[in-house]
Swiss-Prot record:
Name this polypeptide is given: Sterol 24-C-methyltransferase ERG6
Pfam families: Methyltransf_11 (PF08241), Sterol_MT_C (PF08498)
List of residues that carry N-acetylserine: S2
Further comment found in the protein's record: Present with 53800 molecules/cell in log phase SD medium.
Enzyme Commission code(s) on record: 2.1.1.41
Modified positions (Phosphoserine) in chain numbering: S99
GO BP annotations listed: ergosterol biosynthetic process; methylation
Entry-linked InterPro entries: Erg6_SMT_methyltransf, Methyltransf_11, MeTrfase_SMT, SAM-dependent_MTases_sf, Sterol_MeTrfase_C
Organism for this UniProt entry: Saccharomyces cerevisiae (strain ATCC 204508 / S288c)
UniProt GO MF annotations: identical protein binding; sterol 24-C-methyltransferase activity
Reaction catalysis annotation: zymosterol + S-adenosyl-L-methionine = fecosterol + S-adenosyl-L-homocysteine + H(+)
Coiled coil: none
Length: 383
């Protein structure tokens, strides 16, 4: 199937699943308004790639089907993410007394600062979700943002929110595959990605595309999901944690940190910063919202978010969604989605506590001033 045909089919399926009025409803209300048969199909499309197998053949199948797997994943989980987490789908560090919303915004501000984003810059957000980070970074810096996403539902929601918050003049969101970007070479002043390029079947492929569209002298900053130096691919317990993260987060394969670092260098980037922000002695761990440990709750404003994302809250949501599904209020397959997300939470907490996994490996890389875009190399890397 050609890229054009795939995009048309995905757009048509999104309309069947979500309807035409996307944006006004969020969370569980959006879930309840989905087309039942289309939701069932979306869940089946996603789960067929995760059948409990962790062998090389199963891994290769997921890597080959990354585009459809990622599109299907966000069709089924976006409403749950907004319900439990908000419009910025990423983790962050927490400081004593800091609210959840403040920590999320600070994490985004820090990336923008490290990337050197300035007022008037044209910036690419790779894997933009529903536009939460793009809106925050645009407000924080005064830059102009283009958000790239392969999920039609999220693009429609991102555009709706940009209009709602009077930011449409500062940003736009486009459909595309980050392994085959449609932008002209040397287009963007800066590029960033927040916990998104982990969906790539090959990091060198997406990084080479970013290198291609970034102007010479421009900066790319990313929070990457990787397995750390403590991870052993041959350790069954380690592999189980990685698989739980892959299953629940729509990731074809979790790569080791060295793979990411080498991929950046192989694409021609000068790596300026390589730092695991999760490797610290913070009193409050980055994964605390998933743990169910109430001692970490900072203030009353955090209680609602923490309850929804904690173990107890997730069990409550699963039970509620199961009842709603039986009553016909939620589309069939919804409870399977909550089960997959529960697997992800278990894996993320286990990976965080053991420091086998980090969701915030910060890389800041620069495209040399005298760089000539290696178009042929870029094409080879995506294959």
């Amino acid at each position: 199937m050609s890229e054009t045909e795939l995009r048309k089919r995905q757009a048509q399926f999104t309309r069947e699943l979500h309807g035409d009025d996307i944006g006004k409803k969020t969370g569980l209300s959006a879930l309840m308004s989905k087309n039942n048969s289309a939701q069932k199909e979306a869940v089946q499309k996603y789960l067929r790639n995760w059948d409990g197998r962790t062998d090389k053949d199963a891994e290769e199948r997921r890597l080959e089907d990354y585009n459809e797997a990622t599109h299907s994943y966000y069709n089924v989980v976006t409403d749950f993410y907004e319900y439990g987490w908000g419009s910025s789908f990423h983790f962050s560090r927490f400081y004593k007394g800091e609210s959840f919303a403040a920590s999320i915004a600070r994490h985004e501000h820090y990336l923008a600062y490290k990337a050197g984003i300035q007022r008037g810059d044209l910036v690419l957000d790779v894997g933009c979700g529903v536009g939460g980070p793009a809106r925050e970074i645009a407000r924080f810096t005064g830059c102009n943002v283009i958000g790239l996403n392969n999920n039609d539902y999220q693009i429609a929601k991102a555009k709706y929110y940009a209009k709602k918050y009077n930011l449409s003049d500062q940003m736009d969101f486009v459909k595309g595959d980050f392994m085959k970007m449609d932008f002209e070479e040397n287009t963007f002043d800066k590029v960033y990605a927040i916990e998104a390029t982990c969906h790539a079947p090959k990091l060198e492929g997406v990084y080479s595309e970013i290198y291609k569209v970034l102007k010479p002298g421009g900066t790319f900053a990313v929070y990457e999901w990787v397995m750390t130096d403590k991870y052993d691919e041959n350790n069954p317990e380690h592999r189980k944690i990685a698989y739980e993260i892959e299953l629940g987060d729509g990731i074809p394969k979790m790569f080791h940190v060295d793979v990411a670092r080498k991929a950046l260098k192989n694409c021609g980037f000068e790596v300026l910063v390589s730092e695991d922000l999760a490797d610290n002695d913070d009193e409050i761990p980055w994964y605390y919202p998933l743990t169910g440990e109430w001692k970490y709750v900072q203030n009353l404003a955090n209680l609602a978010t923490f309850f929804r994302t904690s173990y107890l809250g997730r069990q409550f949501t699963t039970a509620m969604v199961t009842v709603m599904e039986k009553l016909g209020l939620a589309p069939e397959g919804s409870k399977e989605v909550t089960a997959a997300l529960e697997n992800a939470a278990v894996g993320l907490v286990a990976g965080g506590k053991s420091k086998l996994f980090t969701p915030m490996m910060l890389f800041v890389a620069r495209k040399p001033e005298n760089a000539e875009t290696p178009s042929q190399t870029s094409q080879e890397a995506t294959q």
